[in-house]
């Protein structure tokens, strides 16, 4: 869960059976709320929490040799340089064979990832766009 905020997506994944969630959030106010939410839900054993910037997730040693089912990106709407993150996901070989990247963006954001990922599905909700991506083989 990159750009985790208060952790709603990752915590929902835990409630639905995820074995482990890696949270990356560097905004201190959101991080504090996320820590409280984790404690309140008593799911500390299923969580790894990092205060690193999401753009540095690839330096996290706990992710080395991991294979993930799902990677969620919910950056601030003004953030435009997600290609670096997507490239690092590929370099680290983080996704399982049928793993997905879920991207939550402003509906008008133009993304540039077609050479790495294919769009499985994309839907707009109000001012948001949620896109499901799969690695091109």
Enumerate the language-model features and the residues they cover:
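Class I S-adenosyl-L-methionine-dependent methyltransferase catalytic core
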Residues: 1-137
């Amino acid at each position: 869960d990159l750009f985790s905020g208060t952790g709603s997506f990752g915590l929902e994944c835990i409630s639905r059976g995820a074995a482990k969630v890696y949270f990356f959030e560097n905004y201190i106010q959101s991080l504090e709320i996320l820590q409280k939410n984790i404690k309140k839900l008593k799911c500390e054993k299923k969580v790894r929490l990092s205060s690193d910037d999401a753009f540095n997730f690839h330096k996290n040693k706990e992710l080395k040799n991991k294979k993930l089912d799902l990677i969620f990106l919910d950056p601030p709407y003004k953030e435009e340089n997600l290609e670096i993150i997507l490239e690092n996901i590929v370099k680290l070989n983080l996704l399982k064979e049928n793993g997905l990247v879920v991207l939550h963006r402003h509906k008008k954001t133009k993304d540039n990832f077609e050479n790495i990922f294919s769009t499985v599905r994309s839907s707009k909700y109000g001012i948001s766009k949620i896109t499901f991506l799969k690695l091109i083989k």
